[in-house]
A protein has these predicted regions:
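Flexible loop/hinge segments that line or gate small-molecule binding clefts
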Residues: 103, 121, 125-170, 191, ...
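Hydrophobic alpha-helical
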Residues: 128-131, 196-257
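Short beta-strand segments enriched in small/hydrophobic residues
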Residues: 18-22, 58-73, 182-189
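Structural motif
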Residues: 96-117, 168-169, 214-235
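An alpha-beta-alpha
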Residues: 169-214
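Hydrophobic alpha-helical segments within soluble ligand-binding/sensing domains
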Residues: 158-185, 221-231, 249
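Amphipathic helical "hinge" segments at domain boundaries
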Residues: 34, 38, 47-114, 118-121
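N-terminal helix-turn-helix DNA-binding module of bacterial transcription factors
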Residues: 1-61
Length: 257
């Protein structure tokens, strides 16, 4: 198998120095004459040369890559957010690497180390899990952004997402205003800050003294289906069901029809 062309090959074919080729590909073309730029471009095209992003990141201690960690890449909401982020990054000349944590703390910690090894320009955490490693990372790096799940207490970092408590509160208040009976909350894991905030908001919106059946489950369609099956099979009645996210709601709807 032929070796990929190098910067030296481009310099040799174009008749310029390797320093000139390096300046051109590192975005410093203003220091290179138009004639030499044209020669470098022709040589690179003829050889099929592309600069090494790894080599560039080692030289600059930073890459053009932004790493996004997500809890479940199969979730429609997660996919929509990832596509939007990638589109925005492309507009400013950056690329994105998407990695799945599977809602596992150890996997998230390993991926944080991978991002550090890649010299990622920034890390976007959707559905972050509070771990000592994450806290260490937040303390050492400024380019971390939390999405959809707020950073835990003591971690100062930018957050993009909704007010989960207020969202739950609005639904609870709506239930009361509409006269819905037998409220049920099928919510996400309690150890996730967003899940807790949504549930607490919902209970607050219902008001003191409200009796609410609660089911804790994963943020998946199957989990929502299983909870609804258990509820409807054992006690057939009319329920007003609050679902913590759309995937749980899809599962509940499938069980109810």
């Amino acid at each position: 198998m032929a070796k990929p062309p190098t910067i030296r090959d481009v310099a040799r074919l174009s008749g310029v120095s390797t320093a000139t080729v390096s300046r051109y590909f590192s975005g410093k073309a203003d220091a290179v004459s138009p004639r030499k730029i044209e020669s470098v471009q022709r040589a690179a095209k003829a050889l099929g040369y592309t600069p090494s992003e790894i080599g560039r990141s080692l030289r600059l201690s930073q890459s053009r890559v932004v790493m996004m960690l997500v809890p479940d890449a199969t979730n429609h909401f997660t996919a929509d957010v990832a596509v939007s982020v990638e589109s925005a990054l492309k507009e400013i000349g950056l690329s994105m690497v998407l990695a799945n944590t599977g809602e596992k703390a150890a996997q998230q910690d390993r991926l944080l180390s991978d991002a550090q090894g890649l010299r990622a320009r920034a890390i976007i955490l959707q559905g972050a899990i509070d771990t000592p490693r994450l806290r260490e990372f937040v303390a050492q790096h400024r380019n971390l952004i939390f999405v959809n799940r707020m950073p835990a207490s003591g971690m100062a970092a930018p957050y993009v997402g909704i007010d989960n408590f207020q969202a739950g509160f609005s639904v609870g208040k709506y239930f009361v205003e509409r006269g819905y009976i037998n409220p049920v909350a099928i919510h996400g894991p309690r150890h996730y800050s967003g899940s807790t905030a949504r549930l607490d908001g919902f209970l607050g919106g219902l008001g003191e003294g409200a009796r609410v059946r609660q089911f804790e489950c994963a943020y998946t369609m199957q989990a929502g289906y299983d909870c609804a099956q258990s509820l409807l099979e054992n006690e057939p009645a009319k329920y007003s069901i609050f679902c913590a996210n759309d995937m749980i709601a899809y599962g509940v709807h499938r069980a109810a029809v």
